[in-house]
Amino acid sequence: MIQIKAVFNGNFDLLENIRVSPFSRAYTFSDSVYEVLPFFSKKLIALERHIERLQRSVDAINITLDIKKVTDEINQLLSASDFDNGYVYYQVTRGQDLIRSHMYSDKMDIETFGYITPCSFETKKLNVMICEDTRWGRCDIKSTSLLANVLNMNNAKSFACDEIIMHKDGILTEAGASNLFFIKNETVCTPSLSNNILPGITRSILINALSNKGIKVFEGDFNYLELKTATSAWLTS
């Protein structure tokens, strides 16, 4: 049996021993953000970029976070892990609220939770469904509020699709859990960053890598119908 290492509010234990209060605002309001950090051969990929994005997320929802402590906990999880390849999931919640209210207290104690799990990383062909982007207006924040993604992706699953590609009023945004790239007229294209798109770490790494090879990436607004004439398309996550 695989034993998953975890940390909750600074206390390290096995994942099966972690206990979270039902009064956590992560449960009642999805009042939380998260980050997913991949690692290969026990080495975290783009740690600083992931930490910077987590910092932007907590800043956006007015949570003060000891980012050095978070980084230390992530590294400790990796050091204690038996897995060579996988990812670290780390979540920050505003805290517990015994009286359910949309308005939160400034004196709440934040809750942090992380765990590490094995994962095989591979490139594979996908069947995708194109659908309307029905998510909220701040998808640039890596929020745990993912119900629209869940519903749309499970609808796609019922049609034997692996992923969704979303558009807002006809303009491409992103996939359910990844960023979109495609080639058209021998040009690499990807939707511009906006409130409707999460600034993917792999997205930025790929754009930089292509630029270093002299391959320009065109970022812009694209109608979803343009995918029909694309030479190829891929998702990054």
Task: Identify the residue ranges that each predicted region occupies.
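Helix-start/capping segments and mature chain N-termini
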Residues: 1-76, 98-237
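Phosphate/pyrophosphate-binding loops at sites that engage ATP/ADP/AMP, CoA/4′-phosphopantetheine
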Residues: 78-82
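Ordered, amphipathic secondary-structure segments that act as subunit-interaction surfaces
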Residues: 83-92, 99
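Short, well-ordered beta-to-alpha junction loops that form the rim of enzyme active sites
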Residues: 92-93, 169
